[in-house]
UniProtKB/Swiss-Prot annotation:
This is Dynactin subunit 6. The keyword GTP-binding does not apply. GO terms for biological process: mitotic spindle organization. The lineage of its organism: Eukaryota, Metazoa, Chordata, Craniata, Vertebrata. Subunit of dynactin, a multiprotein complex part of a tripartite complex with dynein and a adapter, such as BICDL1, BICD2 or HOOK3. The dynactin complex is built around ACTR1A/ACTB filament and consists of an actin-related filament composed of a shoulder domain, a pointed end and a barbed end. Its length is defined by its flexible shoulder domain. The soulder is composed of 2 DCTN1 subunits, 4 DCTN2 and 2 DCTN3. The 4 DCNT2 (via N-terminus) bind the ACTR1A filament and act as molecular rulers to determine the length. The pointed end is important for binding dynein-dynactin cargo adapters. One of its GO terms (molecular function) is dynein complex binding.
Length: 190
């Protein structure tokens, strides 16, 4: 499969991205974002822009894929960017296709968030919850349990600043990191 254009991964200074992670397509990673080994970020239907201070854990999959009813060759649809805000946590094994994610959200382990969901800010999608509806999730909503029950919490989840600081210090000791960008569109070679 030949690609039409050069796809690029842009990693801001201050981000920690392990070499063992899989990042494909046009992906921009903001400062102070930590991407664990075995995390996957795939931009096949359009770019993915990840904001500042996000935590993407092992085996999390963030994918900007083509909708089921559109094939990649169908009249070349306009690429739609996936925008991820700041201070979000994508826990182990979660699957996220949401095209717009606000700030301070937590997608817990094994949770699934479909393409037509818009997460505002301060939301928690509980472990193993499957969210595949056409809706905007209101701010500070918690979705939990086997039946995906909902409630509104009074405050947003706290940003994971201490955990990010710890991981930014520890991960480079045990994993090779992808190089950050210095204002260019091509990766820096070793």
């Amino acid at each position: 499969m030949a690609e039409k254009t050069q796809k690029s991964v842009k990693i801001a200074p201050g981000a920690v991205v392990c070499v063992e992670s899989e990042i494909r397509g046009d992906v921009t990673i903001g400062p102070r974002t930590v991407i664990h080994p075995k995390a996957r970020i795939i931009a096949e239907a359009g770019p993915i822009v990840i904001g500042e201070g996000n935590l993407i854990e092992e085996q999390a999959l963030i994918i900007n894929a083509h909708p089921d009813n559109i094939t990649p060759d169908a009249e070349d649809p306009e690429p739609k960017p996936m925008i991820i805000g700041t201070n979000n946590v994508f826990e182990v094994g979660c699957y996220c296709q949401a095209m717009k994610i606000g700030d301070n959200n937590v997608i817990e382990s094994k949770a699934y968030v479909g393409r037509n969901v818009i997460l505002t800010s301060g939301c928690i999608i509980g472990a193993c919850c499957n969210l595949n509806t056409f809706e905007v999730i209101p701010e500070n909503t918690v979705i939990y349990g086997g039946d995906c029950l909902r409630r509104v919490q009074t405050e947003r989840p706290q940003p994971q600043t201490l955990q990010l600081d710890f991981l930014m210090k520890i991960l480079p000791n045990y994993h090779h990191l992808k190089k950050t960008m210095k204002g260019s569109s091509t990766p820096v070679k070793n």
